Amino acid sequence: MKHASISVFVPHLACPNDCVFCNQKRIAGTEKPIADIDGFLAAACEDLSDRFDEVDIAFFGGSFTGIEEPEMCRYLSAAARAREKYKKITGIRLSTRPDYISEHILDVLEEYRVTTVELGVQSMNDAVLAASRRGHTARDTEKAVELIKKRAFSLVLQFM
């Protein structure tokens, strides 16, 4: 079964810090998020639907759950609409920070049928986290993992 991801980059949206290892302009090729998310997803789905059995929509490059809620829901609504139209879309995933996870945020993600939460942990050593200007602690990660594991999400931990 062939699988693909549609990567939607939201460069530095809601990132409170300038972490030493992150250069979203270089990664995404731009500092601006996609303005026409519906058009972008439709074009990507049309392009991929004949070549892949399963496709997921992946929001990367920022702290997705830290985006102002109306804006976050605008992105999630577009993903939900694409998922309804293109039956090969099997999941919606996003990356975020451990300190941007709460019961309320997880309720919102469940409402839009997000399947996977990727936490940018980077380290479980508080000295390393402070030196790299992450702005969260190892305990924040532990709390976020506990909250996510109570729900039906798949969980990915990212380390740099």
Task: Show the residue positions of the predicted features.
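N-terminal pre-triad scaffold of radical SAM enzymes
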Residues: M1-A28, E46-G61, T65, S95-R97, ...
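Short microdomains enriched in Cys/His and/or Lys/Arg
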Residues: D38-L48
